[in-house]
Amino acid sequence: EIETPKNIFDEEIINLMDFNCDQRKDVHFFYTLPFSKNKALIETTWLSDLEDQSLRDYDLQLENYIENNLGIKNYKINFTEKGAIPLFAPSLSNNDKINNIGSAGGMTRLSTGYTFLNIQEHSRYIVKNIDNITEAKIFSLGKKYQFLDKVFLKVLEKHPEKMPKIFFNMFK
C-alpha cells in the first residue's frame, strides 16, 4: 500500500491488469486498487516459473511502475507483502489419515490462483463430516474446470506473448 501527500487516485476506478510493463518472456501485469484519493494497493504479478531468479526484483519493478507508469514521484510505502500461488496440480497424499486442505488439497483454480471459496466450501464439508473424516471424500474441482484449467495453462506455457490479448478479451 502506498500513500501520497496529494489526492491522486479515483477510488471508484481500479486497474486490474496493466500489461504496460516489461514481460521478460513471461506474463507480467500490475494491479492498482485505490482505497482513497491518496492511498492505493499497487501489486505486481508474474505468471512464470518460480525458479527464474531474474523476476525477483519486485521492489524495483514496483518503484519503476509507480514512478514511470502512474507518474507518482512523492509517496511512502505503508505496507508490503510477497507471496506465490502455485499454478500446478499438487501431488496429493495417499495417506488416508491426512486430509489435505488449501492449495495442498487441490483447491486452487490453476487458471486463476483463486482458492478462498473452495477452501470455504471444503471447510463446511469437513465440519459437517467431522465424525467420519477418514471416510470423507477428497476435494476435487469439477472435470470441466480441470479441463479448462489445463487448456489455459497449456496456452500460458506455449504462448505467453498472447496472454495480454487473451486476458483483455476474456474480461471485455
Mark where each language-model region is.
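Flavin-binding catalytic cores
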Residues: 51-81, 92, 99, 120-144
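C-terminal helical "tail/cap" subdomain of flavin- and related membrane-associated enzymes
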Residues: 124-172
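Predominantly flavin-linked oxidoreductase catalytic cores and closely associated redox partners
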Residues: 1-76, 86-94
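Conserved aromatic-histidine-acidic binding/catalytic patches
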Residues: 50, 54, 111, 155
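Generic secondary-structure boundary/loop-capping signal
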Residues: 14, 82, 104-105
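Short acidic (Asp/Glu) and glycine-rich catalytic loops that position anionic groups and cofactors
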Residues: 40, 100-104, 143-147
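FAD-binding beta-loop-beta segment adjacent to the flavin cofactor pocket
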Residues: 24-27, 82-100, 110, 155-161, ...
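A conserved FAD-binding loop/helix module that cradles the flavin
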Residues: 104-125
